[in-house]
């Protein structure tokens, strides 16, 4: 679907701040941000959201998309147990915003928005089957199949980090948690040491890369996609773990899939905002 002449607000709700902007003719403009009272009441946080949207809204806005770090009932627009905002449990975000602004509002998980952002604006353009894989303190994923976001029957698709693995799960071993969980050291310290050439730090990344490679194999067994785009903070250490990651991927049983799948590193700025706006285009296409 063409995005020309469609003015859509995209909102990226994070742990400490909320960011938003307007997508006009495929370009992001009027980027703004506010602090979030993450320890506040439901209503206090809601007013933070309203305050940002009030600064962006005008009569030309056709819809609002918002990405949140939470499981989301996409149809009803209810967010459950939002990370880092304890009071936000079963919040009817879609209804509250539509009641206020009188235009369509779409709500989805932030990893799904990342995938949509890459699909419409980033390295996933022109690819009809891909996964946006975010690797930070956890693992999240957004799945694009046949050029559409796939959320699953209960809006829980893409939670690969929760798949059982060894004695825990993939997220425990294949994300930034790995360093604290296994070696009891902060991941940022490991990254800085690896940049200095510390062999112990590089070895830790290689070990994490082995686990991540196994996670990606599981993804490929489940969804035989053309492309995986890595986002999240751990992607900046790709040079330290990529070889071991690929060693595991190449043991995939279906040789053609392992040979053909591409893994790219996200370079898209404001992917959360862009992806939230793209929720409207995904719905309308």
Predicted regions located by residue number:
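A short acidic/small-residue loop/turn micro-motif
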Residues: 36-38, 87-88, 157-159
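A charged helix-plus-loop insertion that forms the helical arch/lid used to bind
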Residues: 77-90
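A cytosolic small-molecule/anion-sensing beta-strand core signal
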Residues: 24, 68, 75, 145-146
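Glycine-rich phosphate-binding loop of actin/hexokinase-like ATP-binding domains
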Residues: 125-177
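Acidic/histidine-rich catalytic cores of soluble enzymes
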Residues: 115
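Short glycine-rich anion-binding loops that position phosphate/pyrophosphate groups of nucleotides
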Residues: 69-72, 136-138, 234
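General beta-strand structural signal in soluble alpha/beta enzymes
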Residues: 105-109
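ATP-binding/phosphotransfer module of carbohydrate and carboxylate kinases, centering on a glycine-rich
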Residues: 1-63, 73-78, 95-103, 118-122, ...
